[in-house]
């Protein structure tokens, strides 16, 4: 099994060069915000291990909201983020990008502070890699190659299988045998591929096991202290929840139209959001701990198609900026934006509160998990205000939703079974 990983490179945009950067990024698209896989600057389609990628200018329109807490508006930079979700270690993917697309990357990064076009590109990229606070992968081990091969397999079988009803259950097993022979012939001829999974890297297995044990162990060690401090921590939390300002006005119509202009060109969409963490050590400490726990569940529990009860997210992550004064969230999800938000409100509003209620202006919560995102209008206004346009977005398998990936995988698994009953053969044929 090849595990997946994600990365985000962040660099400060040089003052006065943002407009030129945006114009360059626009040349990489075939549709608004949708990358041309073969664009001349960074041809994402040439990188066979890359699931998703994006380039986004992180210009936070809500920086002034923190003044509602009696804190002066900070002077924080505009950043450029290069983000990727890939098969295998993120470091290898970054190195591959630097080696094979160095000329285009230099054209992009020349708009950033401290970039030397004649210097070591890979070293610069590694130095600007941002550690992710938590990240989610829908199905650990499902590679780009597997997705494309199984999609081609489904199309080939669907075109071959007869549409007339079968005369008997026994005929289903015979037809399945014929289809297996057909696939074997197509694989031998090189027209189809069914590549077996690679061995799971030992280093990844060891790291996962250590992480599985280390976080609960740390929790046990700290438990006595938390019990002693819990009355004080609860008092601080409830005081802040009762007094923190809400900032949830409707988003400006022009901003909303700009965001919507970049959506719904495919069955999958992108989401990029940024916001300030509420001032004070308590909120900074609490959001850090909660994201450690969210990351733990994503790495060890939610690895097979679900993030809690939500099934429409391919990849997502949280990352801190500016010494944990700001938080970035990015995701790739199936369906429209409104349905995506409704999915969270109806199924895991408590999870939204855990992760995001530490942001300035979030709808007021109770006991950390209640209210907040459940106040639909306020939540939807809030998230749109904090959403940023994604200037360039790439996905390796357009037109294929997570439901399709699961369906295609079931077809392949049924094909590779050594023997099946007549009932199983009929059920498998119905998948086609």
Question: What residue ranges belong to the model's regions?
Answer:
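Short S/T/G/P-rich N-terminal loop/turn motif that feeds into the first structured element of a domain
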Residues: 1-51, 60-62, 73-79, 85-88, ...
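A short acidic (Asp/Glu
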Residues: 21-22, 66-68, 93-95, 284-285, ...
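An amphipathic, aromatic/His-enriched active-site/gating alpha helix that lines ligand/cofactor pockets
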Residues: 38-41, 87-122, 199, 231, ...
């Amino acid at each position: 099994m090849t595990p997946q990983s994600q990365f985000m490179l962040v660099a400060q945009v040089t003052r006065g060069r943002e407009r030129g950067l945006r114009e360059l990024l626009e040349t990489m698209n075939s549709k608004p915000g949708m990358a041309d896989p073969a664009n001349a600057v960074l041809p994402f389609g040439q990188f066979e291990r890359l699931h998703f990628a994006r380039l986004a200018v992180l210009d936070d329109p809500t920086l002034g909201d923190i003044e509602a807490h009696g804190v002066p508006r900070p002077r924080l930079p505009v950043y450029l983020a290069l983000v990727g979700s890939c098969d295998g270690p993120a470091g290898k993917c970054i190195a591959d990008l630097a080696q094979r697309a160095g000329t285009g990357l230099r054209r992009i990064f020349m708009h950033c502070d401290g970039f030397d076009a004649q210097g070591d590109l890979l070293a610069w990229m590694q130095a600007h890699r941002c550690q992710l606070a938590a990240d989610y992968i829908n199905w650990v081990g499902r590679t780009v190659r597997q997705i494309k091969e199984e999609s081609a397999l489904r199309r080939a079988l669907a075109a071959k299988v007869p549409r007339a009803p079968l005369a008997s259950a026994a005929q289903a097993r015979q037809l399945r045998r014929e289809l297996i022979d057909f696939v074997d012939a197509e694989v031998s001829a090189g027209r189809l591929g069914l590549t077996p999974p690679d061995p799971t890297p030992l280093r990844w297995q060891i790291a996962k096991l250590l992480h599985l044990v280390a976080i609960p162990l740390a929790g046990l060690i700290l438990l006595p202290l938390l019990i002693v401090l819990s009355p004080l921590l609860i008092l601080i939390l409830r005081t802040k929840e009762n007094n923190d300002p809400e900032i949830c006005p409707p988003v400006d119509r022009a901003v909303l139209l700009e965001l919507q202009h970049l959506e719904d060109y495919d069955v999958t969409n992108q989401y990029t959001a940024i916001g300030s963490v509420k001032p004070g050590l308590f909120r900074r400490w609490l959001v850090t701990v909660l994201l450690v726990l969210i990351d733990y569940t994503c790495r060890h529990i939610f690895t097979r198609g679900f993030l809690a009860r939500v099934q429409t997210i391919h990849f997502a992550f949280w990352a801190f900026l500016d010494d944990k004064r700001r938080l970035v969230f990015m995701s790739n999800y199936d369906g429209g934006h409104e349905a995506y938000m409704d999915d969270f409100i109806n199924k895991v509003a408590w999870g939204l509160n855990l992760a995001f209620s530490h942001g300035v202006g979030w709808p007021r919560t109770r006991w950390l998990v209640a209210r907040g995102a459940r106040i639909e209008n306020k939540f939807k206004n809030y998230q749109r205000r904090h959403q940023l346009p994604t200037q360039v977005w790439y996905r390796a398998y357009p037109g294929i939703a997570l439901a399709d990936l699961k369906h295609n995988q079931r077809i392949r698994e049924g094909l590779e079974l050594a023997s099946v009953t007549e009932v199983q053969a009929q059920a498998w044929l119905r998948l086609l």
